[in-house]
Amino acid sequence: MARVTVEDCLPMVDNRFALVLLATKRTRQLMAGARPLQAASKNKPPVLALREIATGKVRFDRSVRDALSGKFDKEKVNIPAGQTRTLR
């Protein structure tokens, strides 16, 4: 089978970072026993997840910008100049 690349998936997702989140989530679902949306193959779960994204079978149910905008508007972090902080 042909290789799946990030460029194959980008038309289906807003940006590369969203693609990573979506592929990770779908890979974890597949590893937990979720049924594949494509014909069974010998591909590993990450490859299968990318194939499903590239064909449009897996997608976000709302835009990434909408999903994240509310989250970051609520959280404000004040760090004094010259200091660093690890957010957990």
UniProtKB/Swiss-Prot annotation:
Keywords of the record: DNA-directed RNA polymerase, Nucleotidyltransferase, Transcription, Transferase
Reactions accelerated catalytically: RNA(n) + a ribonucleoside 5'-triphosphate = RNA(n+1) + diphosphate
Molecular-function annotations in GO: DNA binding; DNA-directed RNA polymerase activity
Any GO BP annotation: DNA-templated transcription
GO-annotated cellular components: DNA-directed RNA polymerase complex
InterPro entries (alphabetical): DNA-dir_RNA_pol_omega, Pol_omega/Rpo6/RPB6, RPB6/omega-like_sf
Role description: Promotes RNA polymerase assembly. Latches the N- and C-terminal regions of the beta' subunit thereby facilitating its interaction with the beta and alpha subunits.
Protein name: DNA-directed RNA polymerase subunit omega
Gene that produces this protein: rpoZ
